[in-house]
Amino acid sequence: MKTTHLKLIKSFILIATVFLTSITIAQDGTIYPLEAPDEPNAIPLNTGGVENQPASETWFKQWGDPMARNITNATLTPFLPDPEKANGTAVIVTPGGGFMWLSMGNEGWEVAEALAEKGIAAFVLKYRLHPTAESLDDFTTFMNRPRTAPSKTSDNTTPPSPPQRDLSNQLEDAEAAYAMIVDRADDWGVDIDRIGMIGFSAGAGLTMHSTLNSKTMKMAFIGPIYGGMGPVDVPKDAPPMFNVIATDDFLFRGQNGVIESWHNAGIPVEFHLYQNGGHGFGLGNPGRTSNRWFDSFMYWLEVNKFLEANTVKNSK
């Protein structure tokens, strides 16, 4: 289990490194300052701060998407469905950003709104991050520094291991989010036996890390979206998994170890490997085959009876 934990951490530091590389290439990748948006529905999780973090939370905009960094106080923001549509299922949504920033729009709020439209109570987890430079100029310099992207090869050779990082803060935040949903399940119309978790990029890593290591989270299903694909040690009580990645994502590299791990453990798994989409596509980008993943996810939930209307009667 410890080996799996370290592999996950290494994979998502690689995400940050390679994802940042694309900034110097993308014409619309300029980093702009952004005033912190109002988050009137964000609920503090009170999980503590971040050691050696002198900078306060700040925001920036890139590719038209609001991003948050230097997060020291985790929050959970509910996106509740119309009561006429509500089916009792809940999903914790974890945005990505290499554990150094969070893509709050593309991989957070927009996804939560789409889930709520389908009758699902969605909860965006703004989890604590590793420290970055205090000033936006210094942060931009760091992100734009020269680096070599991994070569595009068809083999599944394991890339060099990046430095290891601790995800204990992030796991604590995820556990606190889950506990809050359970505690307020009746108020929010949530069936505590139908709480799932999906994440994007590093958020997929946190979703997987929570599944493999949490002693308190009992997810009904998980959905890692363009996350690490290496093999893992699957717990006996692991939930069904819906997994998405594109062949032109630098994380793919021909690997499907996590899929094999789930299959070999005898736990239901669905895998969608798309022709194109790259990395960080959120709900989708124009002209990419990966654009239909959300529809497939909804159908998967439907077939597995998570979208059936449910009269919530929780026994905590």
Locations of regions flagged by a protein language model:
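Short beta-strand/loop motif that positions the catalytic acidic residue
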Residues: 242-245
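Acidic catalytic loop of the alpha/beta-hydrolase fold
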Residues: 247-253
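C-terminal catalytic histidine-bearing segment of alpha/beta-hydrolase fold enzymes
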Residues: 268-316
